[in-house]
Amino acid sequence: MDEADVISKLEALGKKLPHFSDGRINYTNTDYAPVICVFIRFDNQILLLKRSGKVSNYKGKWNAITGFIDKPEPLKEKALGEVEEETGITKELIKEVILGTPYELPDDEINKTWLVCPFVIELNSRPKIKLDFESTEYKWIKPEQLNAPDTVRDLGKSYAACLKT
């Protein structure tokens, strides 16, 4: 699966699902949703954010930066927008952006299949993090810690999907 396949699925979903007043696709009551999953990397460490009680899924779990792909736009633009929104990291701090291989991840516990579009963003320097309402804490970890029990499931799989490209 590649970016064109993701956009094609997004367009099909946009035709059958409801929309918010601003035009974004509403995935609230659907069993399938495309998302970006962005790993911020600096000095061989990965930034994780602890999900707040104000998000709909995986409250209290550690995760990469994520967001619904709820309107047609290039995936890189969506990833960069989510990164700045959730952490305050701007384009000036970014050394490299890598799009991994998108894949489907079923989660039977919440009856939803995620179409995960993973990214790794390599930074030039360690940034000052400014969290928004979606997260309560942040930490830097080694990549081998991505599948710890307090992270969202298969987080390591999403990261690995970026290393194969």
What role is predicted for each listed range?
Residues 42-85:
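Conserved Nudix-box catalytic region and its N-terminal flanking loop in Nudix hydrolases
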Residues 90-100:
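A short coil-to-beta-strand element that immediately follows conserved catalytic motifs
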Residues 2-37:
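Acidic, metal-coordinating catalytic segment for phosphate/diphosphate chemistry
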Residues 44, 101-128:
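Active-site-adjacent beta-strand/loop module that shapes the phosphate/pyrophosphate-binding cleft
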Residues 2, 59-60, 112, 118, ...:
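Nudix hydrolase/Nudix homology domain
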Residues 37, 45, 137:
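Conserved beta-strand and immediately adjacent loop positions that scaffold enzyme active sites
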Residues 88-89, 140:
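Glycine-centered C-terminal helix-capping/turn motifs at helix ends
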